[in-house]
């Protein structure tokens, strides 16, 4: 019976000493009971190390234990195993219920207890109390002595939570912290380890409960040997001492044996001038000794074992590490298992390390836990509950369906069914009760019902079958979950829903089998383990809270709190692989080469200052009152220092320290103080970067197949551009050509050198087939011509290949335009039927008619989107206001005008009134233009008939001569030309152009510094909604458009003003009859030019750019064309800004005639 302390700095061989001692004992006294006690996270590594050193004899004669395993052995031998141990899940669920029940009685934690994450904090505090032997009696005594009122209230409430938790827990359970207390009790009467020889390794500190267990073992064991990382004993140099934690541990151990009257067998000092691990490596030995030495000494010898690398970003950093690892394996004959990569935050680096190491074919194992929240089973359960509790939303439904767990929707065919279903659901706004109803709508319009084709009827039948398959079990589950029930009842309903109704557990088993058959060990373990975790959490929930009455949402809160406590550990899939992990979890054991990545300021050492429920000040007060708890943030800073020291002394032969200049989001980062320290203690070390590397690796670029291929591409490109490249690339190229798997890819590389982002023209025959209708005619609208002028390739994709966006159930700008146009057309018909004149309409007339028309439109189309929600009901009311205001303005415009509305929605190409515009091309083909004019007004004046076109727009629009010239705004001129050419058929005599104008449908918001009279408001509204476009420069015609226009005034309804002399003021909106003729002639030639390019198959990727306005910004096909203005072949069709007079000159030069005016 006695304690022996084995001490030494890092790398002195403490662990090796223990294993050698055990080996010697086995050889000399094979029947002795030998125990090696290590922290839980190191048991696996230690077992491997002992097995490697001692062989199979270790299995029979020695045990590697953690405190948890030790307790398990004692309970099995001496009783106590019957007490069920509550896991973290059950503990958290119980704390949740305790906090909920105490909620209204709490003051300090009343609000905090409802916050996400508080349960974890409360759980940690309870654990801390138990670890440090803080019980109810201790809390009572301490609270009475506390003078600080805030801390007193906090401790009172913590005591209530602590006591209530323990009261409910101990009805049949213990938690892991109780295990040590129970172990302490059982060891008193347990002879299991009597006479054993025990070595305790890898600990830097012990909790009071662990110290108590050690005390009991000391009384029964033959000997207890404890290793501590210490430079020298009995020499604590204050809290900044590097070894402060371990020296305090030594002090506590010495106090323990003194109090218990246990013999001290002395110290074994393993310290030497150069630690055992670094005997052959002076630089690493110098780092171990001087990293935290004050004052420090410098090592000025040659540097071979330390590299510092400054990376541009995380990707550059990990790529450097990957290349260097391959160099070590290739040139230094390292095994992958000899190499470790560590950092302070594995989660941050996991994705980039996985991607790059996989690309470089480096086998690796990431020592971390996986959060199970994203596993398909957990997503499935939460989505199923979300569906029924959140009114069958799209998001929850397709999360549920896309988990791959419903047998009807597994595999490729199942995925296609879900895609078809999703398209329909998005297109028709399926949610809520619509899932319960038969789907009957398949119309293309969101505003009107349409006749359904036979093909679409069959589709609907199939979709309804799918819907039934999905809805039936969910609906039954929904009915079963209604109202309040005990947690046990909810647990039973949920499990039966998953297992009996949907066979989810069977599906999981099939996935596990599939993963095993396909060597997907990680996935097989995940799917198998998550099922067991779910069942375990469900059972714990029933055991702990089974009789608690709650609703479904409360049940899911409890369940998810339990599930959140579980993480799955990944398993190593090979023996020879690089070990990657957090700095706190990886130990030295045989690590020849170590890469410490992410050594940035605030990251390593960590700058975390989370205090938890008890602040540093709280802990200080409690310590004064006799309660010693875990470290405060100040102490943690010094502990972090020791952690850094431990990490930097792991490598036996080679150490690489890297840091990126930018993080994953591109934010700049500074190097850690550790980097500066290394430069000071080893002044000869040179910091490397992408452009400066000290290790001359001639073949660095030849690594794994994919990265080498990438480097080969760069080399071939250089060679293609005339630059010299290394000779070995020829052999690399030949190797890829010889390999069947890579030959095709290398051909792609070669072709890529000749790549241009240009589209070859399609043949005229193909163009005809693509653009002709079923009558072998090419019929199109003006807007389509304008689309071609914007970008020929986008037109080809949209109208040639007929690519369509996924239909979404929403009210878009085109829908709004159609709706407004239709109501205005119906409004005109209505007043005609009632024999009303526009000029006679009152505000009340307008409002009543509009309200009636809109209500009928919505009422008569039950599937209309405007019937779908209160939001759209609001929109409907808003549309009524806008339309009422618009017709009132039109009425006022007509009162002030001698023009009369001749016709609304005048179609050409769709009726006998106006024929399609036929465009005969020079190549012999013909195009036919169809369209619909919103409104045509007519004026008979001095024996002449004048026509003006009004185009209704829901947005602001003005006539832009520059856009017209470039084919981007031709519509009104095309309509005008069609009208004039067909005027004898329409108005029974030859007509002349009067105007082409846009009318904005709106209810404008007026801005004014003061109150306005009703008349002023009316004038401002007329001004805001003034007609915009081109007018015939004829004072009589203009005056007929606004008969209120007087000399010296500006019109409120058209873009014109009159000088005091009575003639018209200068205005670019006014053009002469000859200019109208020029525009008509030019628009025809422009259309012929566009159509000729179209039929010749020109599909250039040539988007228009006008100032900062780029067509690509609003194009749905930019991801197809991959237009890139930085490529030599990709250029915008720039629309230069020109003065109107220059454009008129250009038009005149192109189509002839004379310009009589500006």
Curated annotation (Swiss-Prot):
UniProt binding sites for ATP: 8-15
GO molecular function, one term: double-stranded DNA binding
EC number: 3.1.-.-
Gene Ontology biological process terms, A to Z: double-strand break repair via homologous recombination
Main function: The heterodimer acts as both an ATP-dependent DNA helicase and an ATP-dependent, dual-direction single-stranded exonuclease. Recognizes the chi site generating a DNA molecule suitable for the initiation of homologous recombination. The AddB subunit has 5' -> 3' nuclease activity but not helicase activity.
Requisite cofactors: Mg(2+); [4Fe-4S] cluster
Pfam families according to UniProt: ADDB_N, PDDEXK_1
Classification via SUPFAM superfamilies: P-loop containing nucleoside triphosphate hydrolases (SSF52540), Restriction endonuclease-like (SSF52980)
Family: Belongs to the helicase family. AddB/RexB type 1 subfamily.
InterPro entries associated with the record: ADDB_N, DNA_helicase_suAddB, P-loop_NTPase, PDDEXK-like_dom_sf, PDDEXK_AddAB-type, Restrct_endonuc-II-like
Cofactor binding, per record: Binds 1 [4Fe-4S] cluster.
Protein's UniProt name: ATP-dependent helicase/deoxyribonuclease subunit B
Keywords: 4Fe-4S, ATP-binding, DNA damage, DNA repair, DNA-binding, Exonuclease, Helicase, Hydrolase, Iron, Iron-sulfur, Metal-binding, Nuclease, Nucleotide-binding
Binding sites annotated in the UniProt record for [4Fe-4S] cluster: 791, 1112, 1115, 1121
Quaternary state and interactors: Heterodimer of AddA and AddB.
The organism's place on the tree of life at top rank: Bacteria
Annotated gene: addB
Remaining remarks: Despite having conserved helicase domains, this subunit does not have helicase activity.
């Amino acid at each position: 019976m006695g304690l022996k302390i084995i001490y030494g700095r890092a790398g002195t061989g403490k662990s090796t000493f223990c294993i050698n001692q055990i080996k010697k004992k086995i050889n000399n006294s094979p029947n002795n009971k030998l125990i090696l006690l290590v922290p839980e996270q190191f048991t696996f590594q230690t077992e491997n190390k002992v097995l490697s050193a001692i062989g199979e004899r270790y299995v029979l004669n020695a045990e590697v234990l953690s405190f948890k395993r030790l307790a398990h052995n004692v309970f099995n031998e001496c009783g106590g195993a019957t007490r069920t141990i509550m896991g973290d899940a059950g503990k958290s669920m119980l704390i949740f219920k305790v906090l909920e029940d105490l909620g209204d009685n709490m003051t300090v934690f009343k609000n905090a207890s409802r916050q996400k994450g508080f349960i974890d904090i409360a759980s940690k505090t309870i654990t801390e109390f138990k670890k440090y032997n803080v019980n109810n009696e201790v809390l009572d005594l301490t609270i009475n002595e506390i003078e600080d009122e805030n801390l007193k209230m906090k401790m009172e409430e913590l005591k209530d939570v602590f006591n209530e938790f323990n009261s409910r827990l101990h009805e049949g359970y213990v938690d892991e912290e109780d295990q040590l207390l129970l172990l302490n009790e059982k060891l008193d009467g347990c002879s299991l380890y009597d006479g054993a020889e025990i070595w305790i390794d890898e600990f830097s500190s012990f909790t009071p409960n662990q110290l108590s267990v050690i005390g009991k073992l000391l009384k029964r064991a033959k000997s207890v040997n404890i290793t501590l990382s210490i430079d020298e004993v009995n020499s604590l140099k204050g809290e900044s001492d590097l070894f402060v934690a371990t020296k305090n541990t030594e002090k506590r151990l010495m106090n323990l044996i003194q109090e218990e009257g246990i013999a001290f067998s002395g110290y074994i000092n393993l310290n030497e001038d150069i630690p055992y691990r670094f005997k052959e490596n002076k630089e690493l030995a110098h780092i171990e000794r001087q990293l935290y030495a004050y004052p420090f000494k410098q090592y000025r010898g040659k540097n071979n074992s330390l590299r510092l690398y400054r990376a541009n970003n995380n990707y550059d950093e990990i790529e450097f590490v990957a290349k260097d690892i391959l160099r070590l394996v290739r040139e230094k004959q390292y095994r992958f298992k000899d190499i470790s990569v560590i950092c302070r935050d594995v989660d941050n680096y996991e994705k980039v390390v996985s991607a790059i190491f996989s690309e470089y074919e480096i086998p690796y194992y990431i020592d971390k836990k996986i959060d199970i929240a994203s596993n398909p089973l957990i997503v499935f359960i939460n989505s199923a509950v979300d569906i029924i509790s959140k009114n069958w939303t799209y998001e929850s439904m397709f999360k549920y369906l896309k988990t791959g767990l419903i047998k009807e929707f597994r595999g490729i065919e199942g995925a296609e069914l879900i895609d078809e279903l999703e398209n329909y659901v998005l297109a028709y706004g399926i949610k809520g009760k619509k899932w319960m109803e038969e789907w009957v709508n398949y119309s293309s319009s969101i505003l009107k019902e349409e006749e359904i084709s036979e093909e679409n009827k069959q589709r609907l039948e199939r979709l309804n079958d799918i819907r039934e398959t999905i809805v039936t079990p969910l609906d039954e589950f929904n009915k079963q979950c209604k109202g309040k029930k005990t947690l046990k009842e909810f647990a039973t309903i949920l499990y039966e829903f998953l297992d009996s109704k949907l066979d989810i557990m069977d599906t999981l088993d099939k996935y596990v089998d599939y993963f095993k058959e396909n060597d997907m060990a990680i996935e097989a373990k995940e799917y198998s383990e998550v099922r067991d975790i779910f069942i375990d959490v469900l059972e714990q929930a029933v055991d702990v809270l089974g009789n608690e009455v709650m609703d479904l949402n409360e049940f899911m809160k409890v369940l998810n709190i339990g599930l959140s406590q579980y993480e799955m550990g990944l398993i190593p899939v090979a023996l020879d692989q690089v070990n990657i992990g957090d700095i706190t979890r990886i130990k030295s054991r045989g690590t020849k080469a170590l890469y410490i990545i992410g050594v940035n300021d605030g990251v390593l050492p960590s700058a975390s200052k989370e205090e938890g429920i008890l602040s540093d000040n709280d802990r200080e007060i409690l310590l004064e009152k006799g309660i010693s708890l875990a470290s405060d943030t100040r102490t943690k800073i010094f502990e972090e220092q020791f952690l850094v020291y431990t990490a930097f002394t792991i490598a036996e032969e080679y150490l690489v320290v890297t840091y990126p200049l930018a993080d994953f989001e591109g934010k700049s980062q500074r190097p850690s103080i550790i980097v500066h320290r290394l430069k000071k203690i080893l002044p000869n070390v040179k910091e490397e970067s992408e452009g400066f590397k000290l290790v001359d690796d001639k073949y660095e670029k030849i690594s794994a197949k994919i990265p080498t291929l990438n480097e080969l591409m760069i080399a071939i490109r250089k060679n293609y551009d005339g630059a010299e490249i290394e000779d070995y690339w020829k052999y690399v190229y030949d190797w890829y050509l010889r390999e069947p798997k890579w030959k095709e890819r290398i051909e792609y590389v070669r072709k890529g050198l000749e790549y241009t982002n240009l589209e070859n023209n399609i043949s005229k025959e193909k163009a005809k087939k693509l653009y002709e209708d079923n009558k072998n005619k090419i019929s199109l609208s003006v807007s389509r011509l304008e689309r071609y002028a914007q970008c020929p390739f986008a037109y080809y994709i949209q109208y040639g290949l007929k690519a369509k966006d996924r239909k979404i159930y929403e009210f878009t700008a085109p829908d709004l335009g159609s709706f407004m146009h239709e109501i205005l057309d119906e409004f005109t018909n209505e007043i005609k039927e009632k024999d009303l004149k526009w000029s006679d309409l009152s505000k009340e007339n307008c409002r009543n008619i509009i309200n009636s028309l809109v209500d009928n439109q919505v009422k008569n189309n039950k599937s209309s989107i405007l019937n779908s929600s209160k939001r759209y009901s609001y929109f409907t009311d808003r549309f009524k206001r806008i339309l009422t205001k618009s017709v009132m303005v039109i009425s006022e415009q007509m009162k002030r005008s001698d023009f009369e509305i001749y016709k609304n929605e005048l179609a050409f190409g769709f009726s006998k009134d106006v024929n399609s515009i036929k465009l005969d091309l020079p190549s012999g083909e013909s195009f036919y233009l169809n369209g619909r004019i919103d409104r045509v007004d007519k004026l008979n004046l001095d024996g002449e008939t004048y026509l003006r076109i009004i185009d209704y727009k829901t947005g602001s629009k003005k006539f832009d001569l520059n856009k017209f010239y470039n084919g981007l705004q031709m519509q009104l001129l095309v309509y005008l030309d069609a009208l004039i050419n067909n005027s004898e058929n329409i108005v029974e005599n030859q007509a002349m152009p009067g105007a082409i104008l846009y009318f904005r449908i709106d209810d404008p918001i007026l801005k004014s510094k003061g109150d306005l009279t009703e008349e002023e408001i009316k004038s401002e509204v007329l001004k805001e909604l003034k007609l915009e476009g081109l007018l015939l420069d004829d004072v009589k015609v203009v005056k007929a458009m606004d008969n209120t226009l007087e000399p010296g005034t500006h019109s409120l309804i058209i873009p014109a003003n009159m000088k005091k002399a009575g003639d018209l003021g200068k205005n670019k909106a006014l053009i002469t009859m000859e200019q109208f003729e020029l525009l008509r002639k030019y628009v025809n030639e422009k259309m012929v030019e566009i159509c000729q390019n179209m039929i010749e198959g020109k599909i250039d990727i040539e988007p228009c750019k006008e100032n900062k306005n780029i067509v690509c910004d609003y194009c749905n096909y930019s991801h197809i064309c991959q237009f890139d203005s930085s490529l030599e072949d990709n250029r915008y069709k720039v629309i230069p800004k020109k003065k109107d007079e220059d454009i008129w000159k250009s038009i005149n030069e192109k189509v002839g005639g004379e310009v009589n005016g500006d």
